[in-house]
Amino acid sequence: MPEKYINFTPPLSLRSGHLQSLLGSSGLRRRAVLKRAVALQEAAEVWTLDGGDGIRLQGYYSKHAEGGRGLVVLLHGWEGNVNSNYMLGTGARLYGAGFDVFRLNFRDHGDTHHLNPGLFHSCRLGEVVHALSDLQDRLGASRWGLAGYSLGGNFSLRVGLKAGEAGLDIGRIVAICPVIDPAKAMDSMESGLKFYEWYFERKWSRSLRAKAICFPELYGQETWHEIRGLRARTHYLATKHGYAGAEEYFDGYSIARGRLENLSV
């Protein structure tokens, strides 16, 4: 990596992490990203992957006509999707550098609510591993790269733990700001600026309503989107999926307390 990147320090006016988060989702940023991602998006094909047990996950595959330098799979964060600014920006940079890029949507992210009856939750690791195995087999990929942001970073590292037994030939994993301890992340969100909890609560409500529209026979009478507070809503939905409550659910996808010790990628 060039030294100018290793030693980079943002201008004083842009050092606030909160400001960087806001600017990252701004309209100005969006226009710049879309301009850079034209080639990536023009090359993109919609692929539906086998997640096992009838589960389907969808993503976008951008391949170089003359053969690329290798495959990189990108995983987005919670309530993001394959067209989030950071996914397009990273994908465009990788594609421009000669890599084939696959951007995977998690269940119920993007416009995929109709693909599976069950709701997304962060402990659904098996379907992501199965889908990536399907992708690897279909492409004949070897020593491919996996990168994820936030919750996607958490998934990437957990996929790495399963890589050996699943036969995934992952050469490198990059996790950007991964969720390490979900319980502590929730504590921080509740004690920090209320904007973040409001932002995710609003996006999650929209997603849950979309799910109910796709499967009215299953969720038409549910009022989960009306439960205020991320912890309360998480607790309610966790109990619907076999967990004692939010804390047990958080522990189910935590990678804290030595759980990455056996990561060999």
Language-model segments: which ranges?
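Short, hydrophobic alpha-helix immediately C-terminal to the catalytic nucleophile
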Residues: 88, 92, 129, 157-161
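Short, surface-exposed "cap/lid" segments of acyl-processing enzymes
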Residues: 56, 62-115, 134
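N-terminal cap/lid segment of alpha/beta-hydrolase-fold proteins
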Residues: 26-67
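Catalytic His-Asp charge-relay segment
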Residues: 264-265
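Catalytic nucleophile-loop/oxyanion-hole region of alpha/beta-hydrolase
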Residues: 93, 107-145
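N-terminal presequences and immediately downstream first alpha-helices
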Residues: 1-33
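Alpha/beta-hydrolase-fold enzymes
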Residues: 141, 145-241
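Active-site nucleophile elbow and catalytic-triad environment of alpha/beta-hydrolase enzymes
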Residues: 238-259
